[in-house]
């Protein structure tokens, strides 16, 4: 038990002293996950609302496929992106493998179905009434989508925050496409996995505490929005 207590003490020292290595990892993690979430949300929210309020022949099949994609393992997404960005892959000429850009691409593809599914479910259940009111006022399809975004902005923000929590907590995809390179592609989750295998518990605990605080902050935001 002593080494655990020592690990926590050393972890707090690393955080309080603003250790450059720790905070480089933290900032990169937040940047990659935030960018990936923003890209996924920008595409999935309008698309999810459009699909939710529209009636088309294969809507039931679309729902089943979408909800299945929401649970795709992160390592599968990472593998697909790595193959696509490898030297012999179709996008190999871009030389993006083992860069933060590759990590953003992988995370965006990973969380896109989640944000799309949450938005689709929300708009399917609550968007019809808003659509009816909008059409009564003479709004077109695009105007209806904008109206739904405005009326359901709190719920949509919760969806985005949930998507971000999925992005920042995953390890498989970023490990594969990023390579966990020190000072370049090393993020919180990949660092914790590596440090644990090396027996460097103080640094692992420090990063674990940061990830835990981010998780608590996300849950606090979601709870406060749901209470409003």
From Swiss-Prot:
GO biological process, one term: transmembrane transport
Signal peptide start-end: none
Main location: membrane
Record bears the keyword Plastid: no
Annotated transmembrane regions: 25-45, 65-85, 102-122, 144-164, 203-223
Organism superkingdom: Bacteria
Residue span(s) of domain ABC transmembrane type-1: 26-222
Subcellular location: Cell membrane
Membrane topology of this protein: Multi-pass membrane protein
Entry keyword set: Cell membrane, Membrane, Transmembrane, Transmembrane helix, Transport
Protein purpose: Part of an ABC transporter complex involved in tungstate uptake. Probably responsible for the translocation of the substrate across the membrane.
Family recorded in the similarity comment: Belongs to the binding-protein-dependent transport system permease family.
Protein name listed in UniProt: Tungstate uptake system permease protein TupB
Gene name tied to this protein: tupB
């Amino acid at each position: 038990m002593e080494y655990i207590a020592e690990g926590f003490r050393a972890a707090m020292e690393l955080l309080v002293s603003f250790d450059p290595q720790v905070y480089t990892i933290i900032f990169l993690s937040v940047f990659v996950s935030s960018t990936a979430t923003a890209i996924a949300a920008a595409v999935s929210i309008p698309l999810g609302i459009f699909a939710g309020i529209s009636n088309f022949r294969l809507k039931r099949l679309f729902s089943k496929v979408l909800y299945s994609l929401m649970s795709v393992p992160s390592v599968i997404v990472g593998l697909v992106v790595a193959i696509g960005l490898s030297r012999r892959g179709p996008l190999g000429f871009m030389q993006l493998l083992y860069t933060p850009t590759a990590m953003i691409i992988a995370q965006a593809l990973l969380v896109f179905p989640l944000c799309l599914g949450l938005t689709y479910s929300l708009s399917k259940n609550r968007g019809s009434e808003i659509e009816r009111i909008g059409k009564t006022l003479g709004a077109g399809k695009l105007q209806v989508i904008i109206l739904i975004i405005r009326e359901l902005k709190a719920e949509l923000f919760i969806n985005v925050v949930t998507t971000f929590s999925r992005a920042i907590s995953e390890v498989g995809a970023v490990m594969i496409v990023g390579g966990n390179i020190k000072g370049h592609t090393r993020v919180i989750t990949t660092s914790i996995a590596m440090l644990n295998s090396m027996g460097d518990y103080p640094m692992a605990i420090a990063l674990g505490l940061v990830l835990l605080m981010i998780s608590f902050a996300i849950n606090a935001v979601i709870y406060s929005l749901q209470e409003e």
